[in-house]
Amino acid sequence: MKMIKNEIENKILNVRRRPANMRKILKVGKPLSATYSHSAHTLSILAAEDDNKGWLLNCFVQLFGDRCDFLDYQDFGFMECPIIDTQHIGIDMVDIGWKSRIDFIKMAIINDYYVYAELNTSKIKAYGQSVVFAHDALIYGFDEENKQFLIADFFQHKKYGNTWIEEDELKN
């Protein structure tokens, strides 16, 4: 337990020692398939590394047949991917452990963690919606000078892509 605490403290110190107006973007690539957010996000992370291509082509199968009439389209995501290490951190823990959710997201990205989070699409212009709706997005970059975050999801025209959003949009 003490080792974990020291590791977390070291990561927090690294965030505090970082340069002002930092910009960091984690690598993503074009996903092999972009049908649902959870699989598109996972596949875009995996597509960033050429070494993953063999695994994807040999092990990722989205189409399958079964005698069951029920079709389950939720068969793949980051939690099921054996070559991605995931951690589930509840928003209550984020609120307890960090000054703000924005600071948590920045710290995660600085330490090379992608952030998968449900966002209120009515607060983010790129979605082009006014109705309150939660949708899972991938946050993988930030720019402190412009106060923006880089996210990937299915935006206004329902095509998977990425865009920079204002920090205030993410706060809401």
Q: How would you label these PLM feature ranges?
A:
Residues I4-N172:
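Conserved active-site-adjacent core of cysteine acyl-enzyme catalytic domains
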